[in-house]
Structures are given as structure tokens and as C-alpha cells.
Amino acid sequence: MARGIFITATGTDIGKTYVTALIIKRLRETNINCGYYKAALSGAERRDGKLIAGDANYVYNIANIKGDPNDAVSYIFQQAVSPHLAAKLNNVEISMERIKKDFYSIKNKYDYITVEGSGGIVCPISTGKKKIMLDNIIKIFKLPAIVVADAGLGTINSTILTLQYMKEKNISVKMILLNNYNHEDIIHIENKGYLSDNLLIPVYTCNKNANNLEIPVEKLIEIYEEI
């Protein structure tokens, strides 16, 4: 049976894709067959008449995943707006059935699957005939989660608010990862210490522009759960 994890963040442009790529890369370097999936992506580039799923393309390149990155994303939009608005602008009805079909297709190819969210945890995927929130996708696939947060000023507030929302939605958070971490920045050091001391969730860091995660592979494997 495959194992999975969901990567979310405290907001947009925090570094979900970057962290996701490094996690998958770390596992694949130890011969773990780990794949990638994303339900909806906006802000795609158009090349030669085709939309390119930039996040997926980045992950595939960094983690050395073979195949077409676009196949790992159910809905790809050019406009750099939230998925529900992009769907409106393109007259597209986002379907949970298609998301499920694509997810299970990816799941059948890999032993481990890493699912990346869109924006922060409170993200409308569809406001059409059937309302879909990001947390609906997490719960349907019974995925635990990693929360990516920026290491800098304000992260205590945004991280705890994110965790509170996820607790209300009964989503299991396995790890907090502080991105852009600087070991010499007193704010970063204090933020990590505060979160570590006040939460019952492991807190790890990712240095800015790091090529690898300084997290033991065993710890990463532990947080993936059977799905």
C-alpha cells in the first residue's frame, strides 16, 4: 500500500514547491519510489501554445522524476490567481472526481506520494456547483501534513493560526518546517525555539537556497502514512 503526505504552508510564496522538491529528492536518492501530485496550479507559463505547470516542472527537475510534469497536475491555469478564481476566468468547473481519478493514477505508480497544496491552508479550489476547499482534498485522501512556514518575523502568529485551523478540520500535522532559515539570525533562532517549546509537533529548518534538507531520511519516512 502506498504512503502519502500533504505539503501546505502558512501563506503564498513561502516555499512549498521548493521544500516539496527537496523532500522528494531526499527520498528518491535513497531509492524510495516517491512521486508528486498537485490538484490545481495557477500562474503557469505558456510555451509553444502549451501551458507548463511550473511547480511540477521544478519538482520533477530537482527530484529527478521521469515523465511529463503536467501529468501530475489536474488543473493548470495561466492566471496567477487563486485556483477558484482561475477556474472562473476560464469557465472551468473543477471536479473532485477528476482530482480523485488523477490522484489514484499517480498513487498507483509510486510507493510514496507527496501532494502539494495551493497557497495557504485556507484555499478555495472551486466555488462552482460543488464547493471544494483545500482541506476537503486532504481529508478525502486521508493525508497527514507538513506545514511550511517562513523562518522570519511574524511566523509564530501565522504558524499557530494555520495549526489551529487544521486542528479544527481534524488534519494531522506531522512536522513544521521553517524555510529560509539563518542560523545567525536571532529572530529565526527565537521563532524556532518558541515553536519547539510550545507545540507538540517537531520543528525543522531549511536553510535559504539549500540544495538538500538536513533532516534524517528516517524522520521523513516516518511522517508518510498509509493511504
UniProtKB/Swiss-Prot annotation:
Pathway: Cofactor biosynthesis; biotin biosynthesis; biotin from 7,8-diaminononanoate: step 1/2. It catalyses: (7R,8S)-7,8-diammoniononanoate + CO2 + ATP = (4R,5S)-dethiobiotin + ADP + phosphate + 3 H(+). Its cofactor is Mg(2+). ATP binds at residues 13-18, 55, 116-119, 179-180. Substrate binds at residue 42. Its EC number is 6.3.3.3. Its main location: cytoplasm. GO terms for cellular component: cytosol. The active site is at residue 38. Keywords: ATP-binding, Biotin biosynthesis, Cytoplasm, Ligase, Magnesium, Metal-binding, Nucleotide-binding. The keyword Electron transport does not apply. Catalyzes a mechanistically unusual reaction, the ATP-dependent insertion of CO2 between the N7 and N8 nitrogen atoms of 7,8-diaminopelargonic acid (DAPA, also called 7,8-diammoniononanoate) to form a ureido ring. Homodimer. This is ATP-dependent dethiobiotin synthetase BioD. It comes from Clostridium botulinum (strain Okra / Type B1).
